[in-house]
Amino acid sequence: MKLVIVESPAKAKTIEKYLGRDYIVDASGGHVRDLPEKAIGIDVKNNFKPEYVIYPKKQDVVRRLAGLSKKAEKVYLATDPDREGEAISWHLMNALGLDDNYSRIMFNEISKRAVNEAIEKPGKINMDLVNAQQARRILDRLVGYELSPVLCKKIQGKLSAGRVQSAALKLIVDRDREIKSFVKEEYWSVTAFLKKLTGSDIVFKAVLESKCGKKIKLENKEKTDAVLKELEGKDYTVESVKKSVTYGNPPPPFTTSTLQQESSTKLGMASNVTMQIAQQLYEGLDLTGLGHIALVTYIRTDSTRVSAEATAKARETLAEKYGEKYVPQKPNIYKSRKNSQDAHEAIRPINLELTPESLKDKLQRNQYRLYKLIYERFLASQAAKAVYDSVNVTIKNGDYAFKSTGKTMTFDGYTRIYAAAPKEEAGEDNEKIPPLADGEKLELSKLSPEQKFTKPPAKYTEASLIKLLEDKGIGRPSTFATILSTLYKREYIKKDGKSLEPTELGELVTVYLEKYFNDIVDAKFTARMEEGLDKIEEEGADWHKILNDFYPPFREKIKEALSCLLYTSPSPRDYAASRM
């Protein structure tokens, strides 16, 4: 008998159907060991040696798996192919006393081909990944265990601070400060509604842009009225008509981050809900008539890379369903973001023959909606570009120049499969302009001045915050949903519609951390820590170094905060400072 251990029963059920009777597939239910719940569990003086204990609720699981492993001729550890998965396998190896009688297997998708290929090419646990996870866990424990009690003494209540959550909270607080301190400024625009003298009744808009070649600024009504007076009674003449063909590029396939962003924007799903459903699609579901199958590849990835086999299948599907003109001459290849680990493919369907429509009656509503989003995004990523006829017209009135732009789609390309985002759609057919010639005179229908005011920066949504966290290198895409969930749970932030706002408690916590622990809330510092963890994983850097570099100065700040800390209630001054 051979034993395969995975994290979840759903994943076990999917894998079991692909292996023969010689295999037993069982689940650990995630981590079986961790640092102790009621003690720090780290010997700082002994090079940050961690003390791992088996979760009380996992004692029976460990006993069961240990019994099976003793009977097995071979044990395969098949946890997820990332830091956390590697750490789970390492803890299982130690808790079960496997010594060298194990193999580590990984797959990017749970399919018969992928599982059997992994069985045929077993490896061993990658200690660089384990050490990166250990370093992160110890860092987070040190910060949480030592800093949270300080917050509780300073501010009433059971509070927590975290290495990543606090930096994310500060971004939200800072944006709220920007909005509250924003002073709107008046400005004006002037729009001419024009049409041809003959041959067309189309009225189109042109916006005043410059005077004597310099961009014009109209700060008030007086300046605007003066310009309107100068424009009176003068001809509107076409100075130039510039036509061009422009292209709309298809979007890349999803990464963990972009899936969460798009699911929030298009489906209105919270990031934690998106990840829960995506996990179900990855691990496998019982589908009527199909059995227990997985639908998408591994969902924790920052890569847009796709296998040659999957790319070829996408191109074949496009040709069959939409015609050859929707297939570009060469496959679309996308560059992954800077600092992406690129260990896994992008998120994509495992089997393109399982279309969303064919599964609609077999999936729950949100499972169907998310699968449809992933399926269509992947297919569109290999489709041809959208094509537009664009026209830019400059119209003169004396020294003044007006601009009018129009864009008409001539080939829908990828947009036939995957609807463009609202901001892209806004640019299409934005002004219907009749055929015009240089030097042609136009008739003015009306001249419309409009008072406007500058707007404050927008509040973050879950989608825009996740994008910012990724751009700044705060956390990893796989942790973004957890970061947000923690901030909600601690009542540091709240939602107003789709917008994120800090609570008074969140503001107060940030003010205190800025004063005594600025590194913890500094985005650049947090990003450098993430880079250090990446170096442990990718280059085998010494994992103790990042802890030795971080902890001594952090401990001094803890001592400083405690030395001047006699319990004080939150004061009006604290709240006022948070709003400055």
Each PLM stretch: what is its role?
Residues 136-145, 249-256, 276-290, 334-352, ...:
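Core structural elements
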Residues 217-252:
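Metal- or metallocofactor-binding catalytic centers and their adjacent structured scaffolds
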Residues 114-187:
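C-terminal or mid-to-C-terminal helical accessory/interaction module adjacent to the motor/catalytic core
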